[in-house]
Amino acid sequence: MLVGSDGGVAFSASGGSLETRSKNFHTAQYYTVAVAPFNMFKNGKTVVYGYDPEQGSWDPDASGGAGSFVYKMFTTIEGHNDVFSGGMQDNGTSIQADNDDGFSLANDFGSGDGAATMFSQNNNNRYVVYNYVYNNSVRVLNLNPGQSNDRAGRYRISNNEDDEGDFINRATLDSNLGIIYANAGNGNVRAYYNWDDFSNANSVKDNYVISGLGATATALNVAQFQNQTSTLYVGTENGYLWKVSNAENTSNQTKEIISGNDFIGSVSDIEFGKDENEIFVTFYNYGVKSIFYTSDGGQNWASKEGNLPDIPVYNILQSPLDSDEVIVGTELGVWFTNNFSSENPTWAQANAGMKDLRVTDMDMRKG
């Protein structure tokens, strides 16, 4: 399990207590973190080159004679089980890989502010989506074996300067169908598609807009329980939870509000349990109930606030081994409960080795 916060990254090798950060090289906060599936890099070799020209030198004969920087900083991924990435404040998007829960170097393959970062969950098509601010520069790094991952080989999904969405923009990935959904502001979500065959690195990819959601999207997630259609869930800044069925089909979409009556504030996270009927929703405001759960697809909602202090909650994860074990990332670090099914769960801090910092994102390795 990987936890990103104002103080950098902490990790848990067992899904339990967080390890002490003995190597404090990250000074910038991680806005987002992402973990590759366990067996994604079991076979084949992938080399990711860094972005920073100061780590390389200019070669006038590279890129077919056009000249380019030859980078010295690179990460080799070959048989690694622990591969993770994240978007950092002012420090681009990094990638790390190791096999022994030990110290590994972070390699910045982006630049500027790193934002939404998402690994493919399809082991047969390896890539990581990364973003600069707004929707100005959404890109995909092809991690399939044998690919060139220098700067020229990265795939451009969007390239504009109209500042669509938020500065650090919310997004989600349907890696079954190859669609990136990103907040586009004003009640809209932009969907980028027709790119995951990696046929043209430099062309801006096709996109369409899902409109009529009423307010800015502050949380998005795709239910990854089937691969024929795309069901998108969108939480908004005015406290609504939308379900968009057939989100991949511009002519056959259906949108419905499945919010609870007690939803007040801005939605910060949407996660799923064992199936699409189990949905977890959190809010990042003070003075409101921050954690809700449904087991019937949104027909009935229960507050799971319990004894949690009045603090913003930014993200939530359920243990895949015990449905009663749930953790949340908050303004004051990570909190956990072992009795989530109770009407009033008992929450306690789980910050061993990590300070009382804002936890901006959490991700759990699949597969």
Over which residues does each language-model region extend?
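Beta-propeller blade termini and top-face loops
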Residues: M1-G367
